[in-house]
Amino acid sequence: MQFYNSLIEGILVKRYKRFLTDVTLLNGEEVVAHCPNTGAMIGCAEPGMQVWLSPSNNPKRKLGYTWELGVTHQGHWIGINTNNANKIVAEALATHAIQELQGYETVRPEVRFGHENSRIDFLLSSSDKKDCYVEVKSVTLLEEGQGYFPDAKTVRGQKHLRELAAMVEQGYRAVLLFCVQHSGIQSVKIAEHIDPKYAQMFKHAVDVGVEVLAYSCAINEQNITLNQRLPMIV
């Protein structure tokens, strides 16, 4: 996934009210940028971090910048914008870069499904395969060398697990794909210490046949691409 506009470098001053960040640009100007990440962002929003913003010329927007990338004080690259995870995976599906999801004739994004009126991130279809429902989650939480999801309690995530498990029970294929946007994460584990209910539902989903994949990303100020499969600690 390429950034169409050149990103603007700066230094993070602070993140506040979940969706706002103060950033000092390299020319000394201080701007307020939109933070497109609703999670706790533990370790991903430390003052003094090097950050990159995407500019917007849309006059209807209140804020002229969006926070896209960061580099931790330990030197790890992070994809801040969780909306990019679906774009990264969409590109990987289009180029057949995910070995476990190859061989499907069509890829449809944002398809309604299930009894709870959810939207699945991707529905893969083929005349010789059963439909495959793919839900994408962005992972950025690193604690003591281990990557975790979620970084905050997620009722929405619990709903997605219920729906994926239900699709498997109806005879379809369902995949939960963790898009790891943190260069320091080498494996992914469910954060039972943060959301025990999600961990319980995740175990049930795996038990009934929901498949789980975790992939790292190669991140720089020009683009983010899905890179290689990571161990998923279940």
Swiss-Prot record:
Name of the gene: sfsA
Species lineage: Bacteria, Pseudomonadati, Pseudomonadota, Gammaproteobacteria, Alteromonadales
Protein name, entry field: Sugar fermentation stimulation protein homolog
InterPro entries: SfsA (IPR005224), SfsA_C (IPR040452), SfsA_N (IPR041465)
HAMAP family linked: SfsA
Pfam families named in the record: SfsA, SfsA_N
Family (UniProt): Belongs to the SfsA family.
Intrachain disulfide bonds: none
UniProt xrefs under NCBIfam families: sfsA
A molecular function (GO) term: DNA binding
